Amino acid sequence: MMEVRPTTLIDHINSPADLRALKPEQLPQVCRELRRYILEVLSVTPGHLGSSLGAVDFTVALHYVFDTPYDRIVWDVGHQAYSHKILTGRREDFRHLRQWGGISGFPSPKESEYDTFPAGHASNSISAALGMAVASAAKDEKRKVIAVIGDGSMTGGMAFEGLNNASSFPNNLLIILNDNNMSIDRNVGGLNRYMVDILTSKTYNTIRYDLYKGLRKINLISETNRKNLLRFNNSFKALLARESNLFEGFSIRYFGPVDGNNVLRLVEVLNQIKDMAGPKILHLRTIKGKGYSPAEKQATIWHAPGEFDIKSGERKKGENKPEPPKFQDVFGHTLVELADRDERVVGVTPAMPTGCSMTFLMKKYPNRAYDVGIAEGHAVTFSAGLAKEGLIPFCNIYSSFIQRGYDQVIHDVALSGSHVVICLDRAGLVGEDGATHHGVFDMAFLRCVPDIVVASPLNEHELRNLMLTAYKGYDGPMVIRYPRGKGVLTDWRNTPRLVEIARGRCLTEGEAIAFLSIGPIGNMVQKVVERLAEKGVSAAHYDMVFLKPLDEEMLHGIAKKFDTIISVEDGCIQGGFGSAVMEFMADHDYHPRIRRVGVPDRFIGQGSVPEQYADCGMDADSLLHLTEELLLHP
């Protein structure tokens, strides 16, 4: 790894207090140095580049104007908060971003007092910040609370729930809207700047609030008329600005747009509005990838580009040899094949078309692929509506995000028996994104839902088979879970075949011990079985394929043959696949010795998947050791 050294100013910033000791005219240099440092680190330690570069200026401004950590900053998603981490005492640790034993790629309260609320998922910042603001007011504190949310996260319903509730409280809540994708129409530039200056002036706001408050106290104006005057005031502003503003419809004062990449202007505006009473929103226009030309020109590619050469802008590639495809691409190609067969086949994704390869369908059949925004619950119910009218939706959602649509899976899909295929991408441990993004809970919370099928393929062929079966061989709700990244087969384009629901298969016959696995982790288990065979241990291996319903015929046979069973899953062992096996054995009065291998009852940190497997005792060496211990002590 290249030696990375921060430069002049930021080398002496170990806390926001150090930042606030600088002169305002030094802040642009701080921003340049932060961008340079982020580029140098991320070129060799992959992370979220584009959003972090775009957020540098307003991050510096927030820590310069507000008294953090007493004042709270709540980050939505948090992948844009790299400069925040650098400024809050983690400059050196930043070199080990998203690594095992290093710092998280997202804000984490366990890591720093400046990380006020855990982040990773979208649209929750306003609700969390509002709760903090209300609590601070209840304790008669003067703390200011700031929520930082992107325009993408504003597509999530929870953000609007927070906005709606915020209007009920007079607390000093500031919402920073980081708009880097033109999601909100542009305001008039010169007039808008004038309006921001006027509306943020101390004189204007003091007179405005004191007048209404005083009039009410001396009963010269009723509450109704006071509100009417406020409406008149808002209408007058709208007339001047030639627009009607969504946020002020929530009774939240709106300022902007402001150039979110002009740190001096941001300091000026933040100082003007920070002491205003009531909830308010500051709309910032930022450029994703700001300061690095390749990232500015291709925002999607440079969101998380992997390793790259800073000077040339070329992303580093692996060796030029045949490799298995990503499970995501197999899903994308197979979905297009099914869509070629049947015009009823459609795709749905909540804002992850590139990540899940829904883009393949979008390119060929743009009118049959729907990106519904960051709205997982809506995506599920939208799919149920499509199915109700005879379409066959493949709803692709990351496993960690289906948690946000659990009620809809039960109420709107399973209860009605809708022919919806839910494909859970990034199931299992996911590596560097860490605890907020692991897809380890889905098997536990889905297997208790009636009238739903849950399956996980061993490899790419099985994924294609299950997708065909979900489309043609089963007319109810079905969940297919598969991991992030590459599969195991280079020759993966098989002709898909229908598979029987609730039917597993024996991969290796054996006598001494039985392994039961589900999903791609079975490939690692198979290698363990082969290593045991080299040592003279006859181990059997069964790929169960279906979590729900289980292959009970196969389980009866296993229970009658083996005294010792090891279940292996890439998911939480509490209530997961292994628990399902144990429940079956108990229900049928079988008493084998069972050991469950999976994710233990704790949150697993960031790092590589092999490191996470080893930490959880799910790697090949741990399985070998466990097997030998069980056989030595029957």
UniProtKB/Swiss-Prot annotation:
Binds 1 Mg(2+) ion per subunit. It catalyses: D-glyceraldehyde 3-phosphate + pyruvate + H(+) = 1-deoxy-D-xylulose 5-phosphate + CO2. Its cofactor is Mg(2+); thiamine diphosphate. Coiled coil: none annotated. Mg(2+) binds at D151, N180. Keywords: Isoprene biosynthesis, Magnesium, Metal-binding, Thiamine biosynthesis, Thiamine pyrophosphate, Transferase. Its EC number is 2.2.1.7. GO terms for cellular component: cytosol. InterPro entries: Dxylulose-5-P_synthase, THDP-binding, Transketo_C/PFOR_II, Transketolase-like_Pyr-bd, Transketolase_BS, Transketolase_C. HAMAP family: DXP_synth (MF_00315). Homodimer. Catalyzes the acyloin condensation reaction between C atoms 2 and 3 of pyruvate and glyceraldehyde 3-phosphate to yield 1-deoxy-D-xylulose-5-phosphate (DXP). This is 1-deoxy-D-xylulose-5-phosphate synthase. The gene is dxs.
